[in-house]
Curated annotation (Swiss-Prot):
SUPFAM superfamilies: YhbC-like, C-terminal domain, YhbC-like, N-terminal domain. The gene is rimP. Signal peptide: none annotated. Keywords: Cytoplasm, Ribosome biogenesis. Required for maturation of 30S ribosomal subunits. The lineage of its organism: Bacteria, Bacillati, Bacillota, Bacilli, Lactobacillales. Belongs to the RimP family. GO terms for biological process: ribosomal small subunit assembly; translation. It is found in: Cytoplasm. GO terms for cellular component: cytosol. This is Ribosome maturation factor RimP. It comes from Pediococcus pentosaceus (strain ATCC 25745 / CCUG 21536 / LMG 10740 / 183-1w). Gene3D superfamilies: Ribosome maturation factor RimP, C-terminal domain, RimP-like superfamily, N-terminal. InterPro entries: Ribosome_maturation_RimP, RimP_C, RimP_C_sf, RimP_N, RimP_N_sf. It holds the Pfam family DUF150_C.
Length: 158
């Protein structure tokens, strides 16, 4: 059921985000404790603000309330927000847009006994990711294919 809700909400919210030139990053429908949460993550170049999140929330809420039959029969909380500083990089377009940024990647299989890397994304071409990372005090370059990456997100360098 969760996937059906996500598909339907994505279908309903995409025209709203398109109209405002926002990017629809992700839609989640999850149960936490006793409650269900419908989370819509949006962004734009330069970052999204709280007023823009509220505007999308109001528009989506109105559209969801008008649906018959109701795509979400149980009670839920609607949250519209930014994906945050450590935004997930879910698509090839996300990676291309993040060239030069500090990122975190987790691989499906270890390379030299290591699965997790953080560094600067130097390039992403022909499905090859090139990451400049520190190994103790030395800069190293990691080259992996897009298919080797289990998860990627922006990271905050400490």
């Amino acid at each position: 059921m969760s996937n059906n809700v996500i598909e339907k909400v994505t279908e309903l919210v995409q025209p709203i985000t398109d109209r405002h030139n926002f990017e629809l990053v992700e839609v989640e429908f999850v149960k936490e404790g006793q409650g269900w949460f419908l989370r819509v993550y949006i962004d734009k170049v330069g970052g999204i603000n709280i007023e823009e999140c509220a505007m999308v929330s109001d528009e989506l809420s109105e559209i969801l309330d008008a649906q018959d039959p109701d795509p979400i029969p149980q009670a839920y909380f609607l949250e519209v927000s930014s994906p945050g500083a450590e935004r997930p990089l879910k698509t090839k377009e996300d990676l291309t847009r993040s060239i030069g940024e500090y990122i975190h990647i987790s691989l499906y299989a270890s390379i030299n006994k290591q699965k997790v890397f953080e560094g600067y994304l130097k390039s992403f071409e022909n499905d090859e990711i090139v990451l400049d990372y520190l190994d103790k005090t030395r800069h190293k370059e990691l080259k992996v294919t897009y298919d080797q990456v289990a998860f990627a997100r922006l990271a905050i360098k400490i």
